[in-house]
């Protein structure tokens, strides 16, 4: 058994309104059940999620956080505008985004964008993935899956890795519960984060910085799924999330 990870090269600088699926299909011949992995940065740019820092007016909460942390209140406001809960204010803002993803700065970024601008993440990554997937399937005539990725750090390790934030026609979790291990024991809790694993594999090719490649294709793995799927399946239920519970307890003490 083997699979391929293929970099889709020569993607131009993306601007608002660009037809990403057409640009991708011009550069690679897609096959049935390919998994197209797309960096959230170019999805956001195509959707027009770029804003001038100088045009952002901070509200009371942003000003209060800025006074405590010394950060730019305009950047804080940008993060708050895409957040539904703030857990940590410094040395970075750890938040849960409107889409349910818990990450640093709500994915708002000052890199890979012109000076003085901020790049917001897609508002609804699952919806973005669906639109891209439907258009890619229409152009190519193939059955395809899509993963939109972002780069995240890990709570207890140094370094970043690619993770899935939006999906189309692929289940984010593979449940091994009920299967048997090598010693005939029944697995009770094993759930494999397939979408994140694929995002991480693609990120090895996609890279970071000026030399980054924003699109890769995973070929040879059949994770195609006709069901309507959401990344919400990948997020731990609130009553089971002990880390969030702990962070909320710390907030109350402070």
Swiss-Prot record:
Identify the SUPFAM superfamilies for this entry.
Answer: CofE-like
Q: Which InterPro entries match?
A: F420-0_g-glutamyl_ligase (IPR008225), F420-0_gamma-glut_ligase-dom (IPR002847), F420_ligase_CofE_arc (IPR023659)
Q: Which Pfam families match?
A: F420_ligase
Annotated residues for binding of a divalent metal cation 2: 151, 208
Q: Tell whether Ligase is among the UniProt keywords.
A: yes
Report the record's Gene Ontology biological process terms. F420-0 metabolic process
The entry's a divalent metal cation 1-binding residues are: 109, 150
- Which keywords does UniProt give here? GTP-binding, Ligase, Magnesium, Manganese, Metal-binding, Nucleotide-binding, Potassium
Residues reported to bind GTP: 11-14, 40-41, 45, 112, 206-213
Q: Which domain of life is it from?
A: Archaea
Q: TM spans, by residue?
A: none
Iron found in the keyword field: no
Q: Which biological pathway? A: Cofactor biosynthesis; coenzyme F420 biosynthesis
In the Enzyme Commission scheme, what number(s) does this protein have? 6.3.2.31, 6.3.2.34
Q: How is the cofactor bound?
A: Binds 2 divalent metal cations per subunit. The ions could be magnesium and/or manganese.
Write down the required cofactor(s).
Mg(2+); Mn(2+); K(+)
Q: Which reaction does it catalyse?
A: oxidized coenzyme F420-0 + GTP + L-glutamate = oxidized coenzyme F420-1 + GDP + phosphate + H(+); oxidized coenzyme F420-1 + GTP + L-glutamate = oxidized coenzyme F420-2 + GDP + phosphate + H(+)
Q: Which GO terms describe its molecular function?
A: coenzyme F420-0:L-glutamate ligase activity; coenzyme F420-1:gamma-L-glutamate ligase activity; GTP binding; metal ion binding
The entry assigns this protein to a family as follows: Belongs to the CofE family.
What is the protein's quaternary organization?
Homodimer.
Q: Which PANTHER family match?
A: COENZYME F420:L-GLUTAMATE LIGASE, PTHR47917
Q: What does this protein do?
A: Catalyzes the GTP-dependent successive addition of two or more gamma-linked L-glutamates to the L-lactyl phosphodiester of 7,8-didemethyl-8-hydroxy-5-deazariboflavin (F420-0) to form coenzyme F420-0-glutamyl-glutamate (F420-2) or polyglutamated F420 derivatives.
Name of the protein described by the UniProt record: Coenzyme F420:L-glutamate ligase
Give the species. Methanosarcina acetivorans (strain ATCC 35395 / DSM 2834 / JCM 12185 / C2A)
Q: Name the gene.
A: cofE
């Amino acid at each position: 058994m083997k699979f391929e990870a293929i970099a889709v090269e020569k993607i131009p600088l993306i601007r608002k309104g660009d037809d990403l699926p057409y640009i991708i299909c011009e550069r690679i011949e897609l096959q049935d059940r390919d998994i197209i992995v797309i960096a959230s940065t170019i999805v956001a740019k195509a959707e027009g999620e770029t804003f001038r820092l100088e045009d952002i007016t901070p509200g009371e909460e942003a000003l209060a956080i800025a006074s405590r942390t010394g950060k730019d209140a305009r950047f804080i406001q940008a993060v708050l505008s895409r957040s539904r809960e703030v857990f940590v204010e410094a040395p970075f803002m750890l938040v849960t985004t409107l889409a349910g993803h818990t990450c640093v700065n709500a994915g708002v970024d000052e890199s890979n964008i012109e000076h003085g601008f901020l790049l917001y993440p897609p508002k609804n990554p699952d919806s973005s993935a669906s639109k891209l997937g439907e258009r890619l399937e229409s152009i190519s005539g193939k059955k395809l899956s899509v993963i939109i990725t972002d780069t995240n750090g890990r709570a207890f390790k140094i370094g970043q890795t690619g993770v899935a934030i939006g999906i189309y026609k692929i289940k984010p979790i593979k449940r091994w519960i009920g299967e048997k291990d090598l010693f005939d024991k029944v697995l009770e809790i094993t759930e494999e984060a397939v979408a994140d694993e694929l995002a991480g594999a693609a990120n090895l090719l996609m890279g970071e910085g000026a030399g980054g490649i924003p699109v890769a294709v995973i070929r040879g793995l059949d994770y195609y799924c006709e069901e309507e799927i959401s990344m919400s399946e990948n997020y731990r239920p609130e009553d089971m999330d002990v880390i969030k519970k702990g962070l909320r307890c710390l907030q109350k003490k402070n």
